[in-house]
């Protein structure tokens, strides 16, 4: 059941480079990222071996406090790739072959990050959805964060955290507008405790008539797309049905 419905958090920030600029400031023994988080270089390098440059650039102090003392030797990473847009399936997998986009999920001691990287510019840029679904044996904190990184049409690197969030008893979802531009990477992170599975899914609106209302019309279910996102049957064909990812805590 839904516990909360609409949450709109808007932020659009320019930054120097998605791929090449790792931090605002470097000293002999620390790095300060663009969110102002001061990280020892040894810790920064260890985390960078797990997370993307984008994540490291904009990791918040709250996120850093959650993950800084985790045992990185126990980090689990799974990835799927998908080339078949409109493949109406609820497949949950750990590997596919792709020319379009890749979905990755990281478990760092219960702090789970799911990221979607586009290998080519999506033709349709409407309202997409990212969501986590959890087993009943797993608990989730109220803290979660969504980010979208991209290059604008003027070739300027951008960060957007604009989303409509939905909280459910069995997880959380974020609906967001795909921004105009290229080199898109979307990211959803949340903190979990307990033992059991956490499932992740990204669903792209592959129909130009998809609306915000369509992209909000879902619940979380194992019978949904990617084993997570169950759209209203009347509008589910507007989304691409990409397979999902999962991790066992």
What are these regions (language model features)?
Residues 1-24:
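Sec-dependent N-terminal signal peptides of Gram-positive bacterial secreted proteins and lipoproteins
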Residues 83-249:
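Mature secreted bioactive peptide module from preproproteins
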Residues 23-104:
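N-terminal propeptides/leader regions of secreted preproproteins
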